[in-house]
C-alpha cells in the first residue's frame, strides 16, 4: 500500500465516516473526519457553528482543516459540502479520492433524527436541493466511485482495497 492519502467524499449520510474508519483500520492508517476536526479545533458542535456564524464561516473553517489534514498520511472523510469550495477540490488532485454514493431514499433514511444543520426542516426537499447543487463535484474529483445503498460496509471497504491496490500497481508500472 503506497497510497498515503485516501479521501472519501459524498453526500451527507452516504457512509463516508463509517467506511473511512473501517478502511483506515484495514490499512493500518489513521482516520480523520473533517467535521470532527472542526469540532476539535473550535470546541463547538457543527450545528452551533452554523446557527451562530453561518455556513460561509463554517466552509472557511472546513477548508482550513482539510488543508492541514491533507499534510498527513491516512484516510480522510470530508463533510458532505466540502467540495463546494474550489480550493478544496483542487487540493484533492494528488489524492486517491473515493466517491461514496448512496441513493436519495437511502440518504433520507440514514439521516432521519440527525442534527445536520443543512437538513433541517423538510429533509427530503433539502437533500434533493443539496444533490442538485453538488452532484457534479463528486465525479469531478473521484478516482473511484462505490455504491453504499445496499452493500455492507465490509464489501465497500474490500472494493476500495482492491481498487487502491490496482491503482498502486498501475502507478508502479508507469514509473518503470
For the regions a language model picked out, list residue spans one by one.
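Hydrophobic anchor at the beta1->P-loop junction of P-loop NTPases
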Residues: 8
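ATP-dependent small-molecule kinase phosphotransfer cores
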Residues: 33-91, 137
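P-loop (Walker A) phosphate-binding loop of NTP-binding proteins
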Residues: 11
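Short glycine-rich anion-binding loops that position phosphate/pyrophosphate groups of nucleotides
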Residues: 80-83, 103-105, 151
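NTP-dependent small-molecule kinase module
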Residues: 1-3, 18, 22, 26, ...
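Conserved glycine(s) of the Walker
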Residues: 15
